[in-house]
């Protein structure tokens, strides 16, 4: 057999021959060095699977190995032994399809990305033997011919190429184009043809071996379409050719759930319904047809007659607690409402009769199907289904009884909303709270954050087989855990999600201790303080640029919030150095902050900034070395920068990636501090010497960016997690492990000596640091030759003598410069004699290594090489005997324990590095195979065969319109290889025929274009596996490329769905305190839910005192802004407000109201446009943006996404803006230290914006007057008329200042209207009630005895009918029913009755303003978030966009003298126009046929009611002129808005126009009666 070397071609071989020997020698040396680097670390285990369809799973028919892709790696799994082998794709492209050869010796893979290749691998050697690069975008499916001579590959839908490849000759023998999207391919048993299936596509391709062998060039491939008949519009998701007796038949399944059989004439012979919503995959052998369907269902049919045989058991249900599945009964029991993952891929092992299934939650099961009545589970594993964001290694606990997890455990978190606890040595998990489960050998526990089980499914996989992409809205509803951190004592697990919620779980009981909305955006980093610090703090850093410091020892009470950064914070770390506790943080603003902890008061901790460093590149991650002296930071320019923590000076810089492009994403030091691992955006991993910067190892295998990595505590492994949902466990080389363990032993030994000789705690810390530093001989002297940035500024931290900086400079650099170390030459030589030399000296005499190993064993590692006494193999629990049978099919006694036990013989043969002490070939120890069967009971899955009806076609169904000898459009007779038989695709039509099947003409270019357009993403074609970009770099751009921007997927959208004021960050930023260093304990108690989250009891004294000292307006506001997850908060808002209104007993108006910086009157009026009868909110949008708004939005784009700030001033007496614009204390617009430190931002944009906003304030109080008129009451009807005219006058926008009267004693003040700031209210009615304001002192004196009833009446009518009119004019179908209106009126009446205290108007202002505030888009907040969509507040009412340009501004307090006759004329004309429009609309709906649409009746009723309301308002106005001092009582107001006759009788007069109103009502009643009669006649 002529094999082709990996990556070689004729051209490359010719170039090699022509090259000079010296060039070849140099290249050979370089290649050897690179190979050494990649071989230093080997892939030991993969915890993940990336199968996207049935073509991604295959089984070796000889050995039973199951092959599946995991990123850029092919995993070869032996289910019997639970053993993995791996094939790494050297091209770094994602593997999309694979298949075994019939003899099992070779494996063919297809990949995605630019210019993908089809590769053939030797399974035994795991090396590449052949390569074909004839596709452009990606390989959809591959298959070997039964003779292993040919390989067929089909490209992606944009590629549309089918290639038949003689892979041993490296020749493409035949090719053709295919017009449809192809998802599957299958060879016939005799290799004479193969079949492709896809969207409305089943095609038979015929191989003419005689012709292809004679012609050296590629010949056109002959293809003929299957005759689909009625099913031609279906999506065929998978295809399989028959075996033995049914070898002439071909079986397909459709996405709609049909199993179809084609006969040898390509005719659709018969089909059967699978009784499922979706069918994904099919597998055919001699005896059975397996059909993988939705909800974990696998149907089994007889291939001879398509009769139903059985349904296989389902896998685990979604959301199951796998830690409790320790018995077979728990696995095979099913709840009534249980949901299961879909079956997406299957493969069959004919030797063992095992069926392997992959489900779309990334789980793999191997079932024993020897007996369909007794199907057992042989193997199963569960993995993450989405991006894995972070990993944490469970710390080593000295007291094993205190450990919550077994040794060698680690924790991962993912976008699938789960936190998973893994263990690499499952035989050792006894003695902890977690026990062995029967679902996974590696996974111990799944912590599901919420009840949304859909998040557990792979969103990239389109289970329906349709072309619609995954629902991005469903993606955004997921929480997704972004970061995790384990406390040093191993008791608590902290996690932060994408929405900013912080959770803390107790690992012993797995209960949730804390859940608080800490941030406005995703939490990027969590960090517990080290035990050396003497503190138990938790730092939470987020994309909202804030750091919250919580004290874990005090129930996670908030200690401090830091807002120095001006952009996303990517990392935060604690360190204890020189007796000081320090915090270091870095972020996307290119800044590094060093802070020192100080004690404030008795026990509070306060961090103050000591150093601020700015670099020219974004800082993506940071880690502190174990000595706590240096911080290593990974930067966007692919450099690692080392900083001294004490001085803040940069100590060293070196490259952190071998590639020339990309960005460093993560950095991580090992437990000894000798090495540092980095991950780059090119998906590669590298390990460098921490002190010299020399690369010692490289790794690849992930298909997406590596998002996290950690060294294990035993220094044997490096674990990496990635966006491809996989967890890779890498085994480090023996030399690296030995070096790290030797280093740890020396550090511990010197630490013990220092502890014994030290007499003071501070001196202990200093000497321990020096002891760590003194082991510098381990480092290479190459560091002397490298330049060190800012080295001259290095301070003396770590010196054992308190000397000046100049005298100890050399000593502080001892760790970097060996020549200046404190050790003597003799000590250095002794140390060197004990350890192997570092770097580029990997091949050493065996004697040295043996000595090193012995030294290591003598020090601390004897126990790890002790023989393993654990139980070998799977031992069932005591209660399993009656539940399931353990079938041992293994005839080989495994000499090792189960996976990860690493048991070793008693006699250890010390070996050199070249031998296999840490070699990958020493695979996971084999355990006994165990098959778990359900209880012996009647199988419910055995349904009656008659239930699945087999349907067939009449014998002559194709006689009239099909010519079987006609060449197919993809046949060789078609010169351009064009396809024809498939008619253009019709979206959303799956089974209904849309046009006749034509075979008479070739498709025109136009038809091909139409067909191509139909295959776009909007068409029903499954394209989940097609990458968005050639190398799938979209993941990096979304999650790492824009940390300084706010437009990441799931960022602003998720933030907008949260309550604007629910997180700690929001409350912190809304505080108006002038000092940034003010203690923020008050943030814990500003809302009703936060004390419960942070404090153990609601009756905390601080809470009581804080609540009592709060102004009632602030309390009311806090109750208005509650979490959207608690919808009942909004429903209870009225109740809270009434309660607080009962409390007020002070003066008429509080000081808060006197000094309140008001919104413009636009806001006050527009608030009424927002509240509907049932508490819903109708949002209005400003059409024109001011310059300040544009600047504000530009700043939002430069800052982080956050929520809307809408809070009152939390400190009484401090001027602030109600909508948060002028709250200077904490605002995203305020300058931060980072922004001021940059030359490019010499003046903070936040300051400019705040200044402009301040100047733009539309209205300001002088603090002396009465704010009562803001309620909008009408005490005097004469004044009401004037106010109404004034309100109408302000419709005209004037850019100049207008004098406006105030209700204060000064009566007048100046205000500036914003030019072009408009609020259009859609089609107002002629005299719709507007808020009116009093304008003179006389008016105030006249209305002073006014009762609360009169003040509420107009407000009630305003809020109701404004919403109604807006809905009516904008054409909204949602109408407020009279009953709802009445309910709203009742609630407002209750408010009136409650407001019998003198301070009623102050609190009503708060209620009225807070409830109706988010009207102005441009002015609502300084946060980059618009309040257009507040899910959870009002789902029933659609947001109404303004249409009418008539009302461009809301009324202001204009004085009477400012009203001109021209303005009155304009208002009067507008009133007439509005009235005519309303009357015209009324006539149109009443004169039309009422039976045509009942909606017209509703509209007519609404208009009639509105007209009546307008008339009553006019009557009130007339009566008010005659008796201005009259005021209604609360009893009079009851029903006043709805029952005008009561008011008529009450006042004893017949108002003008009642006759016309009654006539109008009578006419409407007659029309309504006619409509009902007509409808009844039609029904009869």
Swiss-Prot record:
Record bears the keyword Repeat: yes
Skewed-composition ranges (Low complexity): 799-811
Keyword annotations of the record: Repeat, WD repeat
Family matches, as SMART domains: WD40
Job of this protein: Involved in JNK signaling pathway.
PANTHER family: MITOGEN-ACTIVATED PROTEIN KINASE-BINDING PROTEIN 1
Protein name, per record: Mitogen-activated protein kinase-binding protein 1
The organism of origin for this protein: Xenopus laevis (African clawed frog)
